[in-house]
Amino acid sequence: MTNLRKTHPLMKIVNSSFIDLPAPSNISSWWNFGSLLGVCLIIQILTGLFLAMHYTSDTMTAFSSVTHICRDVNYGWLIRYLHANGASMFFICLFLHVGRGLYYGSYMYLETWNIGVLLLFAVMATAFMGYVLPWGQMSFWGATVITNLLSAIPYIGSDLVEWIWGGFSVDKATLTRFFAFHFILPFIIAALAGVHLLFLHETGSNNPSGLSSDADKIPFHPYYTIKDILGVLLLILVLTSLVLFSPDVLGDPDNYTPANPLNTPPHIKPEWYFLFAYAILRSIPNKLGGVLALVLSIVVLALVPFLHTSKQRSIMFRPFSQCLFWILVADLLTLTWIGGQPVEHPFIIIGQLASILYFLLILVIMPITSVSEDNLMKW
């Protein structure tokens, strides 16, 4: 008798995706982040669902409904902080996942990579709208500043901003629609993640060497299921430690003050995972230029496959490219730090130099270095 998991229409899909999937035998722990992102998404959807049962998307009651969740709902504080810090874990895994893709040349799977970039945009949009919902000072002013950027678009800019606001300022209509979008987007992300996996399984996984692994495959279960479970346990350990010991360490104290349109906070800044993009935005004095740079800082990822000039896929055997990769990582950390600093000397010039270096590295220096390395190989 044939095994049910290989014949049943639904089980067959699960089987070919998570059980009998042929996987390269040499993939390292850097390949754990895909499954960790799946776990993060499930945690966010579940905690978000329970929060939505008690939250009210009205400017008069939003802030107090979050307070009510933390004070009066059974384990409401736990659900709220799991959701808030779960977002941070989500972005840590996302950045490491993208970094892995850049390091090992996984971007050569074009469809998978492009859907990944789309997923990154969707997660960033979801996180931004989620940050607005508690209706604290930073929620309100963050929403005002970021949505106002759209007014830089010629001709339709100001109309577009008012259309998004649903009025002449960030108000009840804005909060209600942000809540609606924040609720629906994670399900769209889950669907996109399914398509992401579909395209990945068309080609099979990449591996650290960047070479074809067709000659040496092992079944996903039990080898990588066990490996993924270890990753999940470590993720949960870090998340629970964060939630139970220092739940507010990544948040902003200003968000514990109810939103007040008449009082601007001294330093408006987004959550830590947007600071690198925020620093790039601020480093350009022109409004439209800043908005374009902000969008390009993420869109540039979609250009990476077309800038691949090396004969080797991975940079595992390319020392110069490795150095440049880690300079890029250091540059992004610098941008993240600058994004959280006030707009004054010397932070302005550091931010501008780091922004220029970011685009130069990806668009110019790394492709040229790849060609140079190939030529050095001929010597």
From Swiss-Prot:
Keywords: Electron transport, Heme, Iron, Membrane, Metal-binding, Mitochondrion, Mitochondrion inner membrane, Respiratory chain, Transmembrane, Transmembrane helix, Transport, Ubiquinone. Pfam families: Cytochrom_B_C (PF00032), Cytochrome_B (PF00033). Heme b b566 binds at residues 97, 196. Its cofactor is heme b. It is a multi-pass membrane protein. The keyword Cell membrane does not apply. One of its GO terms (molecular function) is metal ion binding. It comes from the Eukaryota. The cytochrome bc1 complex contains 11 subunits: 3 respiratory subunits (MT-CYB, CYC1 and UQCRFS1), 2 core proteins (UQCRC1 and UQCRC2) and 6 low-molecular weight proteins (UQCRH/QCR6, UQCRB/QCR7, UQCRQ/QCR8, UQCR10/QCR9, UQCR11/QCR10 and a cleavage product of UQCRFS1). This cytochrome bc1 complex then forms a dimer. Component of the ubiquinol-cytochrome c reductase complex (complex III or cytochrome b-c1 complex) that is part of the mitochondrial respiratory chain. The b-c1 complex mediates electron transfer from ubiquinol to cytochrome c. Contributes to the generation of a proton gradient across the mitochondrial membrane that is then used for ATP synthesis. This is Cytochrome b.
